């Protein structure tokens, strides 16, 4: 249910809908065509009468009206604007001009025209929506109070609830109207859309099926069905649902075409994003958000930030995405300010009454506490939703880090090893946490193998430091000594020599206690011989003497 655009679209070409062929010789009357909602036929009749000199007083008004209902807002605007400039024009022209301007995203012009129109329920509904567009709460409440308990006004109220993310309130209104008007089939699409927004995708499908049984070629309904399939299954299943629309010989209005192009990019995991999404950024609200997501997936955090920094968030999705972008930029730049902003956005969504019990709301609270390094609280929220994310690599990455941060290394290791995404598995954060889990779980050799697979870099040096220090603390002296030995070769710092010396002595003590094979002594001596420190000869003499006494070849 797209009530309006975000961008004026007067310059767009609008496709004319194919004219239906009418059987029989009888010329239909205008009121019959309007009752059948055959607006193409109505325009054809009106234009024919005008050509043969039989046009009536309100011919142009009806042409503008029919063009509006065909989605040809550009032509409708031209007609109503011309009528408004005539002396003594029909007062209805102003509210019609306002409606057309509204649907073209020309909200200022719509407001000016609406205020010139006579007071009516339609004028009040339009001003109600304009107040929402202008974020004018005071005006919004004034026009809200003028709404009556009639279908049009209640539908208008439901759409405002929808746009303000009050989906349950909108559902309640639609269901109440449906109870009394079973033939209002299109309301099922609106109900289905609300359930979609509430993440009840299976319920949305059930409600949508009622409408599609009667109108199987509905562009909006099929698009929503595809979106449900995307959430329930995958992008291929979603794209298959749109195939009929893409192959159709009928021409949906231009906005529906743009919506389909946009959604195909999402279904195809961002394929073609840079070609399709930029022109739609100010037309389809989600296009900006999806382009930001695309940049984040390409690790272009700065470009994502540039695109979203001036967006004033008004929906949970916008707050969440601004939080994610600020968190990513904060980590990349080491900026406490960006991390603080991210934490506040996450807390705002996760703590709100409407989102606190939703999956995204709980993810937000987990993210908030993650940035605050309160990992026990992180786990409270992640544990409550983990059943929904068993195979989600990003979720498991964060979940495993939180497990490890509270010292639950056994479970953390298990979750880390569930991750399949190669990009995550090559990330230093993943490697360092997994290495720590291996060491804490008495598997130092596996941590060492992680290091051996890395290319020489600043990250491999940092991992070596972690292995050296963690293995030393845990009494895995053999791998601590090997790590300190390489560190000493790369950087002849006294602290690395001291670490290696302590680890080598630790290995010797374990040999004496029978917890390490005697043959390891030879490797310890080789490690010590690679050091130029004066203390090393004394240690080597003691070890060699013990080896000779215990018949250990050195």
UniProtKB/Swiss-Prot annotation:
User: Which biological process terms from the Gene Ontology are attached to this UniProt entry?
Assistant: axoneme assembly; cilium assembly; intraciliary transport; protein localization to cilium; protein transport; smoothened signaling pathway
Q: Which UniProt keywords apply?
A: Cell projection, Cilium, Protein transport, Repeat, TPR repeat, Transport
| Localization of this protein | Cell projection, Cilium
Q: Where is this region: Disordered?
A: 1-23
* TPR repeat start-end pairs: 57-90, 92-125, 151-184, 468-501
Pfam families reported in the protein's UniProt record: TPR_8
Q: Which PROSITE patterns match?
A: TPR_REGION (PS50293)
Q: Which GO terms describe its cellular component?
A: cilium; intraciliary transport particle B
What positions belong to coiled-coil segments? none
Record family assignment: Belongs to the IFT56 family.
Subunit composition and interactions: Component of the IFT complex B.
Q: What task does this protein carry out?
A: Component of the intraflagellar transport (IFT) complex B required for transport of proteins in the motile cilium. Required for transport of specific ciliary cargo proteins related to motility, while it is neither required for IFT complex B assembly or motion nor for cilium assembly. Plays a key role in maintaining the integrity of the IFT complex B and the proper ciliary localization of the IFT complex B components. Essential for maintaining proper microtubule organization within the ciliary axoneme.
Q: Which PANTHER family match?
A: INTRAFLAGELLAR TRANSPORT PROTEIN 56 (PTHR14781:SF0)
Record protein name field: Intraflagellar transport protein 56
What does UniProt list as this organism's lineage? Eukaryota, Metazoa, Chordata, Craniata, Vertebrata
What gene, per UniProt, encodes this protein? ift56
């Amino acid at each position: 249910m797209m009530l309006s655009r975000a961008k004026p679209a007067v310059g767009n070409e609008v496709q004319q809908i194919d004219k239906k062929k009418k059987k029989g010789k009888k010329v239909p009357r205008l009121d019959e065509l309007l009752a059948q909602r055959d607006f193409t036929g109505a325009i054809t009749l009106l234009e024919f009468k005008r050509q043969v000199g039989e046009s009536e007083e309100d011919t142009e008004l009806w042409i503008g009206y029919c063009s509006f209902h065909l989605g040809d807002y550009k032509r409708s605007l031209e007609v109503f604007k011309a009528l408004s400039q005539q002396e003594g024009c029909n007062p209805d022209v102003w509210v019609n001009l306002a409606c057309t301007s509204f649907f073209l995203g020309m909200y200022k012009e719509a407001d000016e025209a609406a205020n010139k129109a006579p007071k009516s329920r339609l004028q009040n509904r339009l001003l109600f929506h304009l107040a929402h567009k202008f974020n004018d709460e005071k005006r919004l409440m004034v026009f809200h109070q003028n709404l009556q308990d009639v279908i049009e006004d209640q539908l208008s109220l439901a759409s405002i609830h929808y746009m303000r993310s009050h989906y349950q309130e909108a559902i309640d209104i639609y269901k109440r109207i449906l109870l009394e008007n079973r033939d209002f089939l299109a309301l099922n699409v609106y109900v289905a859309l609300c359930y979609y927004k509430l993440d009840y995708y299976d319920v949305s499908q059930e409600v949508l099926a009622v409408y599609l049984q009667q109108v199987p070629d509905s562009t909006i309904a099929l698009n929503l069905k595809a979106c449900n399939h995307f959430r329930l299954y995958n992008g291929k299943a979603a794209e298959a649902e749109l195939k009929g629309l893409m192959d159709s010989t009928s021409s949906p209005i231009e906005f529906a075409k743009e919506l389909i192009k946009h959604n195909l990019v999402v279904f195809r995991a961002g394929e073609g994003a840079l070609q399709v999404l930029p022109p739609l950024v100010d037309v389809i609200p989600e296009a900006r958000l999806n382009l930001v997501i695309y940049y984040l997936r390409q690790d272009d955090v700065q470009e994502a930030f540039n695109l979203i920094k001036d967006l004033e968030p008004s929906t949970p999705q916008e707050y969440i995405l601004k939080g994610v972008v600020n968190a990513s930029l904060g980590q990349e730049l080491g900026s406490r300010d960006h991390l603080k902003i991210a934490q506040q956005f996450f807390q705002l969504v996760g703590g709100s009454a409407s989102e606190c019990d939703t999956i995204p709301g709980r993810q937000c609270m987990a993210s908030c506490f993650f940035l605050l390094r309160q990992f026990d609280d992180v786990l409270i929220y992640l544990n409550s939703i983990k059943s929904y994310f068993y195979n989600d690599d990003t979720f498991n990455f964060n979940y495993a880090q939180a497990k490890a941060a509270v010292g639950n290394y056994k479970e953390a290791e298990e979750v880390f090893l569930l991750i399949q995404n190669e990009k995550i598995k090559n990330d230093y954060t993943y490697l360092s946490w997994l290495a720590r889990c291996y060491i804490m779980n008495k598997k130092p050799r596996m941590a060492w193998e992680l290091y051996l697979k890395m290319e020489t870099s600043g990250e491999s040096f940092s991992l070596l430091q972690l292995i050296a220090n963690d293995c030393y603390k845990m009494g895995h002296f053999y791998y601590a000594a090997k790590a300190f030995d390489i560190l000493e070769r790369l950087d002849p710092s006294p602290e690395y020599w001291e670490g290696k010396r302590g680890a080598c002595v630790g290995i010797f003590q374990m040999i004496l206690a029978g917890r390490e094979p005697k043959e390891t002594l030879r490797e310890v001596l080789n490690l010590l011989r690679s050091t130029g420190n004066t203390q090393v000869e004394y240690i080597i003499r003691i070890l060699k003497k013990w080896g000779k006494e215990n018949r250990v070849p050195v």
